[in-house]
Regions:
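Extended carbohydrate-recognition surfaces in non-catalytic/accessory domains of CAZymes
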Residues: 3-79
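Membrane-water interface of alpha-helical transmembrane segments
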Residues: 5-15, 174, 196-203
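Intrinsic-disorder/low-complexity, polar/charged segments enriched in Ser/Thr/Lys/Arg/Asp/Glu/Gln
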Residues: 66-75, 81-83, 120-122, 133-135
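Aromatic-lined ligand-binding clefts that engage carbohydrates, nucleic acids, or primary amines
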Residues: 76-98, 136-138
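Beta-strand-rich ligand-recognition modules
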Residues: 94-153
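Alpha-helical transmembrane segments of integral membrane proteins, especially early/N-terminal helices
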Residues: 134-142, 195-208
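Short, aromatic-rich amphipathic segments at membrane interfaces
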Residues: 150-173
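Hydrophobic alpha-helical transmembrane segments of multi-pass membrane proteins
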Residues: 175-193, 201-220
Length: 220
């Protein structure tokens, strides 16, 4: 029993537990950072397509096989907020209108190819456009699964800016750093395996796994 929990085995168990704890912290952090706050726009949505206008309940997505645009529209009363947060829309281009005035755009709505679906978008709402009753329109463009998977919400920029910025860093910039690190580690392990007599060493498989994982993550 002492041998079982000593030496290299104990170290491996310790490293495994540390990895699980780190993963749990990041996972819980992402849930906390992306949790809607403030005034959540969870009811009253309509969807306008080229064929009709119909009421929908968020989250709502649909699968398409050609480039389309979808307009999500909701009416809300005046609230003390200056920022709209749109979490990870299923789209490659987006326009936002408040009371008929464009207040935000990202990607090319005619040729939607931008990677905007893994970001939480902060949209500034000009105070002079706010009324007692406000109409918000979110226009999405894409050629596959399209829609809103998370409720947009209204909040004070001061309250959400740091949280949203950190969430975007973890889901975008941090991922790029991890991809670069995985590529470097993969190349290093493959080169290291060539110094051993046995070509089929664990390092060569770990190196290829790291490189393939980095390539897969490029999709995000």
């Amino acid at each position: 029993m002492k041998r079982l929990f000593s030496g290299d085995f104990a170290h491996k168990v310790g490293y495994s537990l540390i990895s699980v704890v780190i993963f749990a912290i990041f996972f819980a952090g992402m849930i906390f950072l992306t949790n809607p706050t403030g005034t959540i726009l969870d009811t009253g949505w309509t969807l306008e397509t080229a064929e009709d206008i119909r009421a929908v309940t968020l989250p709502y997505t649909e699968d398409v096989d050609e480039k389309v645009t979808r307009t999500y529209r909701v009416t809300f009363p005046y609230v003390d907020a200056d920022t709209l947060v749109i979490p990870r829309p299923s789209a490659n281009a987006m326009l936002v209108f408040l009371n008929g005035q464009q207040v935000y755009s990202t990607g090319n709505i005619r040729q939607p190819t931008a990677n905007i679906w893994n970001m939480l978008h902060l949209v500034s709402l000009p105070v002079n456009l706010m009324r007692e009753e406000n109409v918000l329109e979110i226009v999405l463009g894409r050629d596959n699964t399209i829609g809103l998977q998370v409720y947009p919400f209204l909040a004070s920029r001061q309250e959400v800016f740091l949280k949203i910025s950190l969430a975007n860093w973890l889901s975008s910039d941090f991922l790029l750093i991890a991809i670069g690190a995985a590529l470097m580690i993969g190349v290093f392990l493959i080169r290291l395996s060539r110094t051993f007599k046995h070509r089929q060493s664990p390092e060569v498989f770990m190196g290829h796994a790291a490189i393939l994982s980095a390539i897969y993550c490029f999709d995000f």
